[in-house]
Amino acid sequence: RARPPRPAPAGAPAAELTGLSADRGARTVLAGVDLTVRTGEVLALVGSNGAGKSTLLGAVGGDVPCTGDVVIDGAPLRSWSHTELAMRRAILLQRQTLAFPFTVAQVVAMGRSPWAGTPLMDDDEAAIGEAMRETGVTGFTDRPYPHLSGGEQARVALARVLAQRTGLLLLDEPTAALDLRHQEMVFGVVRRRAAAGAAVVAVVHDLGLAAAHADRVAVLAGGRLAACGPPDEVLTAPLLTEVYRHDIEVFPHPRTARPVILPHRPSGPPEP
């Protein structure tokens, strides 16, 4: 019988990585990463293309082969069955593919599958409804998923993850296909889930979103952890310029004092 998770106190480790390494063929993608993610926080993973962000997220979720130690909910990753792991972590993949024309409601309901046959299956209707409201998809629940726009599909996929109601959310570029309003909506949902006790790890390409919404930022470079800490300590012009190999400027926001991050651009009008 699958062992359900127990409630964790605020600040408890939700995932602990020690010496995490991964290869793809002859190329080292992750090299000795040590990282702890705690309940109640939003941790943003940033870095240039190929830095190892998605691989790290997949390794934490148990979907990418790796060496080193991964501990989820106080026990080694390999000690959990597939169902037990699905009760503890939910993964939003970078790309969502469905071979059949499931409706939006059916896709979101898939997030409840780990709880089938447990007392928590009584929460299915509430969890599905809450997730669809949070992501703004209640207006098209009967539409086939393949017929949706890219942004709509992204929000439905996130709703499925939220409906799973796990203590650890692993989100790979949750805002990549979204406009500005829906980006802010998604991170509002993420912040509320963290405030309610979840641990959230999100791969984010938009450094401004990471600076504005993350409690901590982990910067990956060449498969290694270059820095990890609060946004105002980690997202500095020298480090980002080195990591992205492009001149970066960082300013404090006049109202929030959070870092505002921009690529350095020549002054004056753009050249024709």
Regions found by a protein language model. Give the residues of each.
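Catalytic Walker B motif of ABC-type/P-loop ATPase nucleotide-binding domains
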Residues: 169-173
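Conserved ABC ATPase "signature" region
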Residues: 122-140
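Helix-to-loop junction immediately C-terminal to a conserved catalytic motif
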Residues: 61
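Conserved ABC ATPase signature
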Residues: 144-148, 152
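The feature captures the beta-strand-to-loop junction immediately N-terminal to the Walker
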Residues: 46-48
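Conserved ABC transporter NBD signature motif
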Residues: 66-76, 85
